[in-house]
Regions:
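Intrinsically disordered, low-complexity terminal regions enriched in charged/polar residues
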Residues: 172-218
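Nucleic-acid nuclease catalytic cores
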Residues: 149-177
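Mg2+/Mn2+-dependent nuclease catalytic core
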Residues: 129-153
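Interdomain/boundary linker segments immediately adjacent to catalytic/signaling cores
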Residues: 1-87
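A structural signal for short, well-ordered beta-strand segments and their strand-loop junctions
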Residues: 91-92, 123-125, 157-161
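Conserved catalytic cores of phosphodiester-cleaving nucleases, focusing on short active-site segments
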Residues: 79, 111-132
């Protein structure tokens, strides 16, 4: 189950309506409605960008891949807004911050957000588990290149278990406890670092608590 399937009933309105409420580009509405013809005819540049992402889509069609991408943006944007309301100075910083499907060659690996506290600032990566994998297996897996980048940036990692309404924070400015796995089936045989959740506890999801925990780490 990807973001699109998991979030179908998450909001009081359909996802394409939520996208419109957030002011998303019409291309994202076509994607959420699985209207490939409308996307191809009315947003040809976006459609071509989506096609270039074929290698990222696993067994999904290009439209299914796009639906998961746009649905995850909706959840992230709502999360960011709620954290701002809770007093956190947080802004989007990634290549996809404009919420448009980019050609794969233009997608960078930078962190999703930047959090500021006075003159201090830190990058923060947001990752969501829509299937409850972390709770079920008591571990979270990060691609090796993402993990190494977070260490270089001394970034924060905010993991949200959407299925079980939990969250965790990892401060990559500190030495992290992770096990290297050179080949993980869920990532197409690519290497990952696995984080044992005995060391990184999942907490009950609450926006105020998340904001306080982040501020305490900056």
């Amino acid at each position: 189950m990807g973001a699109f399937s998991a979030l179908q009933n998450y909001y009081d309105v359909p996802l394409h309506v939520r996208a419109q409420q957030l002011g998303y580009h019409v291309s994202n509405v076509y994607i959420l409605l699985n209207d490939e013809r409308g996307l191809r005819e009315n947003c040809p540049d976006i459609y071509q960008n989506l096609i270039t992402c074929r290698h990222n889509r696993d067994s999904r069609t290009i439209m299914e891949y796009g639906q998961d991408m746009v649905a995850s943006w909706i959840f992230e944007d709502d999360l960011i807004e709620k954290l701002q309301e809770a007093g956190l100075d947080i802004v989007k910083s990634g290549a996809d911050k404009e919420r448009l499907i980019l050609a794969t060659s233009n997608v960078s690996s930078g962190s999703d957000t930047k959090v500021r506290l006075g003159v201090r600032s830190v990058f923060m990566e947001i990752m969501c588990d829509y299937k409850g994998y972390w709770t079920r297996y008591h571990r979270a897996d990060l691609r090796d290149n993402k993990c190494l980048r977070l260490q270089r940036e001394k970034a924060l990692f905010l993991g949200v278990d959407v299925a079980n309404k939990k969250y965790m924070l990892i401060d990559f400015a500190d030495e992290v406890q992770a096990t290297y796995n050179p080949s993980h089936f869920a990532y197409g045989g690519k290497p990952v670092y696995s984080f044992d959740l005995k060391n990184y506890r999942l907490k009950e999801f609450d926006y105020d608590s998340i904001a306080r925990d982040i501020i305490a780490l900056i």
